[in-house]
Amino acid sequence: MLFPISMSATEFLLASVIFCLVFWVIRASRPQVPKGLKNPPGPWGWPLIGHMLTLGKNPHLALSRMSQQYGDVLQIRIGSTPVVVLSGLDTIRQALVRQGDDFKGRPDLYTFTLISNGQSMSFSPDSGPVWAARRRLAQNGLKSFSIASDPASSTSCYLEEHVSKEAEVLISTLQELMAGPGHFNPYRYVVVSVTNVICAICFGRRYDHNHQELLSLVNLNNNFGEVVGSGNPADFIPILRYLPNPSLNAFKDLNEKFYSFMQKMVKEHYKTFEKGHIRDITDSLIEHCQEKQLDENANVQLSDEKIINIVLDLFGAGFDTVTTAISWSLMYLVMNPRVQRKIQEELDTVIGRSRRPRLSDRSHLPYMEAFILETFRHSSFVPFTIPHSTTRDTSLKGFYIPKGRCVFVNQWQINHDQKLWVNPSEFLPERFLTPDGAIDKVLSEKVIIFGMGKRKCIGETIARWEVFLFLAILLQRVEFSVPLGVKVDMTPIYGLTMKHACCEHFQMQLRS
């Protein structure tokens, strides 16, 4: 039954005025689209929450499906915040490379302000000349203590020396586990080995596999990726920050612990610093700070706090991405014994057993390289880049994108795009090999995992080298497996870097 609602002419007029005023404010707050351009298309969203429910637990999958309907440039809302989503290799390359200056910003998201007190080189909204100079400084330090050769060592570079040492320790540790409980969770031990490599580069030291302080930090890292992954509702709906949120609280605690750890390491370096005797990246940054050197393009001086932030960025990026890549690789190896055997046959043919693999062997091991590429592509363990934002009003593919617009870059979609890949859901390293057995360079460049353009991961080259060398040394010496009947869960868990479920049933034996 319907009940009539009585309304006087005055009340009706007042309601109409309020409605028109609200409508006008909403329209006025929306940027005016220049002639010849149009707004990016997108689905209808719910009031207040926008498309938050549509994104679900796997935003990369939801947005990939959405791109099939609306195209490579689409727009959604999370809360009341508009977000442009980019898909498609050509579109993303156009935005991040050819129009790199337009898309090099970072959105001012709440969770980003919790990282390094809001001064993180990777997450800070700053994208100006000072940021660029600090990024170059970090790149140079990383290069000097990883790719550069160590005159006191027989290895080709510092990175090779550190990885070779840690891979041997890892094998010994796994042997002890096989002699004891007879099984292990590989992630638990790989993460310490990889962390020791970046610790050697940044701090000139390593840790035991049972070092409690280090374990407490690296084991909390999964929460970091869960919170800062693209689409966190707390970044777009402010009220959620004040409601009970265990993940967000753990994230705050993790960042405080990481910062305190880095602060302690930098202080120790200050106490033992010797001019002319630079031991690692932290020393090189302290030297820069003390000499108050000026960058050639920007007047950049480093405070003690900035040193901590740069080292924290390098440390965080240096262990999480590589650990995740190696961990996924081991999962694919036990799921595909045929592939593991082919890699080992190639290692035996090219290198043999009399010496350890070296970085210089990489170009002679195409099947190994194809396996790594397929692991990157199939897992797409970095589904989105860290969110970008536009630094000025711009357009892309005929669509208008105003300054300050948050931009999600869907790397998962590229790596599973049926226009680029035959049977993308199938794990097939051979897809990257030419008929004569070499790496297909054109196809390999279509795998996107480290971003593109001006915000591309500064450690990409080192990460690729490190993953290769760890796997080559391990697979030359040992064989990985799981017991018959054990089901391995390969379902990715969404985050900034997607992890797989914990697998405690790994086994290892030395190759005969």
UniProtKB/Swiss-Prot annotation:
Kindly provide the name given to this protein in its UniProt entry: Cytochrome P450 1A1
According to the UniProt entry, where is the signal peptide? none
Q: What does this protein do?
A: A cytochrome P450 monooxygenase involved in the metabolism of various endogenous substrates, including fatty acids, steroid hormones and vitamins. Mechanistically, uses molecular oxygen inserting one oxygen atom into a substrate, and reducing the second into a water molecule, with two electrons provided by NADPH via cytochrome P450 reductase (NADPH--hemoprotein reductase). Catalyzes the hydroxylation of carbon-hydrogen bonds.
Query: Where in the cell?
Result: Endoplasmic reticulum membrane; Mitochondrion inner membrane; Microsome membrane; Cytoplasm
Question: Pfam families attached here?
Answer: p450
| Record membrane topology | Peripheral membrane protein
In the UniProt record, what gene is named as encoding this protein?
Answer: CYP1A1
One GO cellular component term noted in the UniProt record for this chain: mitochondrial inner membrane
User: Changing P492R does what?
Assistant: In allele CYP1A1*11
Expressed, tissue-wise, as follows: Lung, lymphocytes and placenta.
